[in-house]
Regions:
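Transmembrane beta-barrel wall of Gram-negative outer-membrane proteins
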Residues: 246-282, 286-325, 349-366, 424, ...
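Short, acidic, small-residue-rich periplasmic hinge/interaction motif at the N-terminus
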Residues: 28, 32, 40-44, 73-77, ...
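C-terminal beta-signal and adjacent terminal beta-strands/loops
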Residues: 628, 680-681, 702-765
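Short strand-turn segments of transmembrane beta-barrel domains in outer membranes
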Residues: 208-216, 225-260, 277, 285
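Face-selective signature of the C-terminal outer-membrane beta-barrel domain
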Residues: 304, 308-318, 350-501, 527-529, ...
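Membrane-embedded beta-barrel scaffold of Gram-negative outer-membrane proteins
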Residues: 364, 370-388, 529, 535-543, ...
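Short acidic/polar hinge/loop motifs at secondary-structure boundaries
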Residues: 181-211, 229-230, 556
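Gram-negative outer-membrane beta-barrel transporters
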Residues: 418, 586-589, 605-685, 760-764
């Protein structure tokens, strides 16, 4: 299969016409002279285009000789147009300097020629400019239609809901930061566990959102979509920030620019380097103090080593520990056993840490090809004490468990080769990608009592490897119609060597095995530019559902990599200059839906599922500084082989909407009033237990000057009682009445945040 990919790519890229020209250069801020990343660059009236990279560099290749108008623009910058004359065989360089201006949605374009599958780019760019980012939760909420829930004192990864999926902690949504994968394969707590708390929100510069299985560079975990976060290449200024709030909350942040505008480290060409550190503490709003502590550190260097080579180095460290109150049963609150913010087992909690190192080398080769290579390493530890069923299994010691990872090592490489090839009057953009990821970890699941280990359920050593390759081709068939076709090939090796307790005898028995499986995932997407303000798209693609190595070895499902098939039609359009709308009608079928059972260390196959829905996102500029936004999402999902009276997909969101009104000024007062709503939905197969919906208001206010900023954030302005994480669970309580041994199956929940006020102050230097 690798050979077929390479041959297909060679045939595509060697069909080039002769004597074409190349235009390359740098986009910089007109005041500071600093290179700017993410600026759209293209030739007026011509299909295709590109965006400046981390060093502000851009390249347009395979151009016919002639005179063009080069346009460059980005949100918050005044668009610039420059006439350019190119000769056959010429490679011309130039520098574009763009000036800042007030944000104007009239400047937003509806297409992304270099990355057409990023149809939410316009929406995402607007949100990144308008919404303040103060937490990992804020970052994830930038994904249109995505909802999150936290249910362990702030220490665990958030539960994610998107496109009719309860993604658990990341099973069906792939997350990365600077090319580093966040999701954990075969994690001891949940497949695809995506703990994003090691990211300092103020360092994030860009988010790319891809919904559905339509993009070839995403494989594992990307059933419902993927989010690519990118940290800043450079700081506009150094910053010190302090935040204090209710419930003993404190946060400190320090970000230092190490090079400024005129210092150099490895070369005399453009370079940047900075460090950032964050400390956070809170006791939270529960009756039992949570003692949550987190530290984050980041260092990043980006530099142009030569005219054709750039290097990015990144290192980060994160550590966290906490106590938790866990999910509580409704009957416990109703009968007065505990308060709404109480706990059945106050000894829950955990600790975790992650250290990352990454190097990215980007090289411009002959024929205007670009080779990008990344190597990365992560070291990860995790230990979590939970009690999901209280005294259902053991009426004396209780049902507390400890899920632990000891020394997970992640080794990875990704490489892409990009090239533009002239095919007559058209330019074919080809990307050949290859990569591998290896996870090596100790996984333990044990019984515990008040955080003291009592016996082992399963334990062993994980080795899991993914090798992948893909070929992605984008070709403008006409001036309006663009074709994107791709194919991805994945190979997985699942290896687990350990023990498993016999359910009858409780004796530990060997659990060992090794299995290799592969899968091919083709994609086909069409984009039609109906007018400068209307783009239509039709997308389709195969993907696959992720799987846990322990479930694979135990034979939980004959189909190791269940297929996913998705379709989508929609449009990004501007009915008036100041209104941007993205709308999509989508469908997704899963061959089998796999659910990880955390307290058993196994995987449950719930059978095939079918989902469809409608996503609408709109951004409107009411005046020069006033903006309105809303996302509305409807999802319908069912288990297709289950009886009609028991075919719901538990916890799958049905209707969600978020939105807000924002006043944004470059200096002085800014503010935002926002809402979020998720509808009630079935929590079990037959819908007899329902997770309760909520409607909340949040607010942000800030005052900014050149050297300082002060602000306030308020969550749940109306102090509504709401449930954050919710599950249908069978549990038993040791109340004075001694509940029946079989316990009760009902809704369990983690209470949502009450009114929560935080104040912050920043100094820029």
């Amino acid at each position: 299969m690798h050979g077929l990919l390479v041959v297909a790519w060679l045939l595509a890229t060697n069909a080039s016409a002769q004597n074409t020209a190349t235009l390359r250069g740098i986009v910089a801020d007109s005041l500071s002279g600093q290179p700017l990343a993410g600026v759209s660059v293209g030739l007026q009236g011509q299909p295709g285009g590109t965006a400046s990279d981390a060093l502000g560099q851009f390249r347009l290749g395979g151009l016919a000789a002639g005179t063009y108008t080069l346009r460059a623009g980005a949100l918050g910058y005044r668009a610039q147009a420059v006439p350019v004359t190119l000769k056959a065989g010429e490679s011309q360089r130039l520098t574009l300097r763009v000036a800042t201006t007030t944000l104007s949605l009239a400047e937003v374009t509806v297409s992304q020629p270099r990355d057409p599958n990023q149809s939410l780019a316009a929406i995402s760019h607007i949100d990144q400019v308008l919404r303040p980012m103060n937490s990992a939760q804020d970052l994830l909420r930038l994904v249109p239609g995505l909802f999150i829930a936290q249910h362990a004192g702030g220490g665990k990864a958030e539960q994610i809901f998107l496109r009719g999926f309860d993604c658990d902690h990341g099973t069906d949504f792939a997350v990365s930061i600077d090319g580093l994968p966040v999701n954990m394969v075969s994690h001891t707590h949940g497949q695809g566990y995506a703990d994003f708390h090691f990211v300092i929100p103020e360092t994030v510069e860009q988010l790319k959102v891809y919904k559905g299985p339509y993009t070839a560079r995403f494989g594992d975990f990307a059933t419902s979509g993927a989010g690519e976060f990118v940290t800043k290449t450079r700081l506009d200024h150094s910053q010190a920030k302090i935040e204090v709030g209710q419930f003993d909350t404190f946060r400190g942040l320090l970000m230092l620019d190490l090079l400024g505008n005129d210092r150099h480290l490895l070369s005399k060409k453009p370079e940047s380097a900075y460090v950032a550190a964050e400390y956070y503490f809170t006791n939270s709003y529960f009756d039992a103090k949570q003692h949550f502590k987190r530290f984050n550190g980041l260092a990043k260097y980006t530099g142009q080593l030569s005219d054709n080579t750039s290097l990015t180095l990144l290192g980060s460290h994160f550590t966290s520990n906490w106590d938790a109150s866990g999910q509580i049963p409704e009957r416990g609150v109703r009968e007065g056993v505990i308060s709404r913010f109480g706990s059945i087992d106050p000894t829950e909690g955990g600790r975790t840490s992650r250290t990352n190192a990454s190097a990215i080398l980007t090289t411009t080769l002959g024929h205007d090809a670009v080779l990008r290579q990344q190597v990365y390493y992560s070291r990860y530890d995790f230990s979590l004490f939970s009690n999901f069923t209280f005294f259902l299994q053991d009426s004396v010691k209780g049902d507390e468990i400890n899920q632990r990872e000891t020394g997970r090592n992640i080794y990875g490489y990704t490489g892409t080769y990009d090239r533009d090839t002239r095919l007559g009057a058209r330019t074919l953009h080809s990307t050949l990608g290859m990569g591998t990821r290896i996870d090596d970890a100790g996984l333990d699941l044990r019984h515990a009592q008040r955080r003291q280990i009592t016996d082992t359920i399963t334990a062993g050593r994980l080795f899991e490897q993914n090798i992948n390759a893909y070929l992605d081709e984008t070709l403008p068939l006409t001036d309006r119609l663009t074709l994107n076709a791709a194919v991805r090939f994945d190979v997985f090796t699942f290896d687990f060597r350990g023990v498993l307790a016999n359910e009858a005898t409780k004796e530990l028995e060997p659990l060992r095995g090794r299995l290799t499986r592969s899968i091919v995932s083709p994609k086909l997407n069409l984009y039609y530019q109906l007018s400068p303000t209307v783009q239509l798209f039709a997308r389709s693609g195969f993907g696959f559902h992720s799987n846990d190595a322990r479930g694979v070895i135990r034979g939980a499902n004959e189909t190791v990599l269940p297929r996913a098939l998705g379709y989508e039609v929609g449009s990004t359009f501007k009915p008036v200059p100041n209104l941007v709308v993205n709308a999509a009608l989508w469908s997704l079928h899963l061959q089998n839906e796999l659910v990880y059972i955390g307290d058993d260390g196994n995987v449950e196959n719930t059978g095939p599922t079918q989902r469809y829905g409608v996503d609408v996102a709109a951004r409107y500029q009411l005046s020069r500084r006033l903006f309105l936004d809303t996302d509305v999402n409807y999802n319908h999902g069912r288990q297709t082989d289950a009886p009609a009276d028991a075919n719901y997909i538990p916890l799958a969101p049905t209707f969600t909407t978020i939105g807000g009104l924002t006043y944004k000024a470059p200096k002085g007062l800014s503010g935002s009033l926002r809402y979020r709503h998720i509808d009630s939905r079935p929590a079990n197969d037959d819908g007899s237990i329902r997770a309760r919906g909520y409607f909340l208001f949040d607010a942000v206010l800030s005052y900014t000057k050149a050297r300082f900023q002060i602000g306030a954030t308020a969550e749940n302005l109306l102090n509504v009682q709401w449930n954050q994480a919710q599950f249908a669970t069978q549990t038993r309580l040791l109340t004075p009445q001694r509940e029946r041994p079989a316990g009760f199956d009902e809704l369990h929940f983690t209470p949502g945040t009450p009114f929560y006020l935080k104040l912050n102050a920043s100094v820029f230097f």
